[in-house]
Design a protein with these regions (language model features):
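C-terminal nucleotide
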Residues: 1-129
Length: 129
């Protein structure tokens, strides 16, 4: 994929993601978020020189998330960084169920069983000097 086309695509996707967050369209947010993550990796795999930064466990986690979402009517989804790391996204209302899913199903695919739990913060704040 030409980088100019990809840049334009990601810009449009970012604008749409903002709208989807504002309108709370969870289904479309999930679809676009996962598509954006996978498109980035597809671009790396088809570039010259090509890169495969996903690992087998990355795909295992993605498939487990898809299965969990389908079987539990959940709003869990994922995004990926530029490496093999999966970032699991979910509404606060599903926190307990998703944490249990992570512990029982996903941690086995994490390096040394380690994972990081994070949440949305309050944004940047100036520090007193």
């Amino acid at each position: 994929m030409d980088w100019k086309i990809r840049y334009a695509q990601q810009y449009q996707n970012l604008k749409e993601l903002i709208t989807l967050l504002e309108t709370e369209d969870t289904e479309k947010f999930i679809s676009l978020t996962e598509s954006e993550a996978l498109t980035l990796h597809a671009m790396m795999m088809t570039s010259m020189p090509y890169f495969i930064l996903m690992k087998p466990n990355t795909l295992e986690i993605i498939n487990k998330i898809w299965t969990y979402r389908s079987e539990n009517d959940s709003n869990i989804c994922f995004t990926l960084d530029a490496g093999a790391n999966v970032h699991v996204l979910f509404p606060k209302s599903e926190k307990e169920q998703v944490y249990e899913f992570i512990k029982s199903e996903l941690v086995a695919y994490c390096q040394n069983g380690h994972y990081i739990c994070d949440r949305i913060g309050f944004g940047a704040k100036p520090l007193p000097i």
